[in-house]
A protein has these predicted regions:
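A short helix-breaking turn/cap at a secondary-structure junction
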Residues: 59-118
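Short glycine/serine-rich loop/turn segments
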Residues: 1-80
Length: 118
C-alpha cells in the first residue's frame, strides 16, 4: 500500500489483491515492469504474491541469504528471496544472493551449502 498509489492490485485482474507484504514486488514482475524483484518473507510474503500474480517466487532456507537491512520480525523465519518470471531466472538470482554475511550470524554456514542453483 502507498499513500500515493493506494492498494497494490493484481496486474492480471485489477479487482483482485496482489497478496502479502511483497505484493508490489510480485505485481511489478507480473506486469513486466522488472525482470526480477527481491521479496522478504517471514510467513508467506514471497510465496503468496508469487502464486497470486503468476510469477516464480520462493522462500530460501533461513541462513542461506543475508537479512542485513531487512526489518526483523522473527529471527528464526525471516529471509529474502527471488521473484521472477521463470524458474531458471529465480535459480540464477538465488545463486547471486546466497552467501555468508559477517553482519548476519545466521549465514555463517551458507558458503558450505552454497552452489550454482541453475
Amino acid at each position: 500500500w502507498s499513500a500515493v498509489g493506494g492498494l497494490t492490485r493484481n496486474p492480471h485482474d485489477l479487482t483482485r489483491s496482489a497478496c502479502g507484504s511483497s505484493s508490489g514486488s510480485g505485481a511489478a514482475v507480473a506486469a513486466f515492469l522488472t525482470p526480477l524483484a527481491i521479496g522478504t518473507e517471514t510467513d508467506g510474503s514471497i510465496v503468496c504474491p508469487a502464486g497470486i500474480n503468476g510469477v516464480v517466487g520462493f522462500k530460501p532456507t533461513v541462513g542461506l541469504v543475508s537479512r542485513t537491512h531487512i526489518v526483523p520480525i522473527s529471527s528464526s523465519q525471516d529471509t529474502a528471496g527471488p521473484m521472477t518470471l521463470t524458474v531458471a531466472d529465480a535459480a540464477a538470482v538465488l545463486t547471486i544472493i546466497a552467501g555468508t554475511d559477517r553482519a548476519d550470524r545466521a549465514t555463517a554456514m551458507a558458503r558450505e551449502v552454497q552452489q550454482d542453483y541453475v
